[in-house]
């Protein structure tokens, strides 16, 4: 709930409370808005009451203080999750009950005036408007003697508040009987939980400003009340009782001792805000503790061994989770997912890397984990990784491929550069052999590797001595003979003569003497 909602709800609650004030003729909405403005600006109960008392003389200071206290308690109830409708309904019930009990209160005041003739004679000149302020100071001293039988039904309600009442503030405004608040842990905790907070009253009394005698312990000092303030003065607030809260005159609260052990401890989800005690220390009165086993707000060593073991195990689990959390923050998560550098423009359907959600091409992948819906994800704010979008739709590539060049028209002419040509798209034939093709210029094979005549005149003309030259030469060119050529190299092989003429005399070979060495070996043996 935002601050504006708190303010609007508080205006409605304060206006409902002002509607219950008798003979209040001012604009209720305007006054409620002014009170809420004072509270929002940091005003306390005392400062707000002083401001209202200076503006509205027809309303008693106690009534204004009750309205301001109700506003503070309503604000705290709203912060604790109470609905504004519930608070308004309770205020309406209290207003209706207060109107019904107004006649009874007047009769009681008349009886009190009749039983106090001496006090009435001693103060004949007092104004009627000051009488409600002086009665709370005079009645506590004479109440045991003058009112022994009055209000027998309200004594059980006032008994729990008597230890907190001072000698000058013992008589309080009668409040309607309301049912006690139901604990959220009924049936779980043995003892009923008291109010969670105990108020600390640091403000002066509204009925007396600096007046009255100052006692021995009233001046500022060790053990006394500083500044003459009475810290024992309390004020009952019906709204606080109806909402299960402590009704006091200030909003400064300090935690008090909680009664009743929480049965959910050490696994209680409320933690420190639990209205019941969480035992963490050893009982000082053990083994003479009067409370039954399992109900004391502190630990008993021999009785709560299982609880101590459970507490230790819970503490170890908490420390382990804390250490794991710190380690996870320090160490980056290793998920094995690598983001695609092309992102939503990736045109590879089988790309193994991560891509943004298909519902938003401008999204970024922040969580390095795969999305469960993958390509069917419809969340435009999804921060997980997905497969390539080219699987479900056509993605235009970032750069289009260059068109292939048109095919080169081949020519049957011979390239004059031969094997030294550097043009990769040369359209002429290139000979790899210096031997002239047997077909010559009539060869039609585009991939022929033999030489072919070149339609260009040789620059050496008739004097060209290169027998493998493919250029055109004028008539009269004389080719040199090949070095080392046989004299009859131009004669066909079938006409070549044999090595010996036909009439040559062939002599027999001399006899062989290969056995002489064998004979010498036998003689030596």
From Swiss-Prot:
Biased composition (Low complexity): 103-160
Zn-finger region bounds: C3H1-type: 262-278, 283-300, 340-355, 371-386, 415-430, 437-452, 458-473
Polar residues: compositionally biased ranges: 510-525
GO annotations of cellular component type: cytoplasm; nucleus
Modified residues (Phosphothreonine): 254
Name of the coding gene: NAB2
Residues annotated with Omega-N-methylarginine modification: 209, 222
Organism: Saccharomyces cerevisiae (strain ATCC 204508 / S288c) (Baker's yeast)
GO biological process terms, semicolon-separated: negative regulation of nuclear-transcribed mRNA catabolic process, deadenylation-dependent decay; poly(A)+ mRNA export from nucleus; positive regulation of transcription by RNA polymerase III; regulation of mRNA stability; spliceosome-depend formation of circular RNA
Family statement: Belongs to the ZC3H14 family.
Matching InterPro entries: Nab2/ZC3H14, Nab2/ZC3H14_N_sf, Nab2_N, Nab2_Znf4, Nab2p_Zf1, Znf-CCCH_2-like_3
Domain notes per entry: The N-terminal domain is required for nuclear export of both poly(A) RNA and NAB2. The RGG domain is important for NAB2 import.
Complex and partners: Interacts with MLP1. Interacts with PUB1.
Protein name as it appears in the record: Nuclear polyadenylated RNA-binding protein NAB2
Keyword Zinc-finger: yes
A GO molecular function held by the record: 5S rRNA binding
Region described as 10 X 4 AA tandem repeats of Q-Q-Q-P: spans on this chain: 121-156
């Amino acid at each position: 709930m935002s601050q504006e909602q708190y303010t609007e709800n508080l205006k409605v609650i304060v206006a409902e409370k002002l509607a219950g004030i008798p003979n209040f003729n001012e604009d209720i909405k305007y006054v409620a808005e002014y009170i809420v403005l004072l509270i929002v600006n940091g005003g306390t109960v005392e400062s707000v009451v002083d401001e209202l008392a200076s503006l509205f003389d027809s309303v008693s200071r106690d009534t204004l203080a009750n309205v301001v206290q109700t506003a503070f308690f309503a604000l705290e109830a709203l912060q604790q999750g109470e609905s504004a409708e519930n608070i308004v309904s309770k205020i309406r019930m209290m207003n209706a009950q207060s109107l019904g009990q107004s006649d009874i209160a007047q009769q009681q005041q008349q009886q009190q005036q009749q039983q106090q003739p001496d006090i009435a004679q001693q103060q004949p000149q007092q104004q009627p408007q000051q009488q409600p302020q002086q009665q709370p100071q005079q009645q506590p001293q004479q109440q045991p003697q003058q009112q022994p039988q009055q209000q027998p039904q309200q004594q059980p309600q006032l008994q729990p508040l008597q230890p907190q009442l001072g000698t000058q503030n013992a008589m309080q405004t009668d409040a309607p009987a309301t049912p006690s608040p139901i604990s959220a842990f009924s049936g779980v905790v043995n003892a009923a939980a008291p109010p969670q907070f105990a108020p600390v009253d640091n403000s002066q009394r509204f009925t007396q400003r600096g007046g009255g005698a100052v006692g021995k312990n009233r001046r500022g000092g060790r053990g006394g009340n500083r500044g003459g303030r009475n810290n024992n003065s309390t004020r009952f607030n019906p709204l606080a009782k109806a909402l299960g809260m402590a009704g006091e005159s200030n909003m400064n609260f300090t935690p008090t001792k909680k009664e009743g052990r929480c049965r959910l401890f050490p696994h209680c989800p409320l933690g420190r805000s639990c209205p019941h005690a969480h035992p963490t220390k050893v009982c000082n009165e053990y083994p003479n503790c009067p409370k039954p086993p399992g109900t004391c707000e502190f630990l008993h060593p021999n009785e709560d061994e299982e609880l101590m073991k459970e507490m230790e195990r819970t503490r170890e689990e908490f420390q382990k989770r804390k250490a794991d959390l710190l380690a996870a923050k320090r160490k980056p998560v290793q998920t094995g997912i690598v983001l695609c550098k092309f992102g939503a423009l990736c045109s590879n359907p089988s790309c193994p890397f991560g891509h943004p959600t298909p519902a938003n091409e401008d999204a970024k992948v922040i969580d390095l984990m795969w999305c469960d819906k993958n390509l069917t994800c419809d969340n435009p704010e999804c921060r997980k990784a997905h497969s390539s979008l080219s699987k479900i739709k056509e993605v235009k590539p970032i750069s289009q491929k260059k068109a292939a060049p048109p095919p080169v028209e081949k020519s049957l002419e011979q390239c004059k550069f031969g094997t030294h040509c550097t043009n990769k798209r040369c359209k002429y034939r290139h000979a790899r052999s210096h031997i002239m093709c047997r077909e010559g210029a009539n060869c039609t094979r585009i991939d022929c590797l033999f030489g072919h005549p070149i339609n260009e005149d040789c620059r050496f003309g008739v004097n060209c001595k290169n027998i493998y030259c493919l250029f055109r030469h004028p008539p009269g060119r004389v080719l040199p003979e090949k070095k080392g050529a046989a004299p009859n190299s131009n004669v066909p092989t079938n006409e070549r003569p044999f090595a010996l003429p036909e009439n040559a005399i062939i002599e027999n070979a001399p006899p062989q003497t290969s056995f002489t060495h064998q004979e010498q070996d036998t003689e030596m043996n």
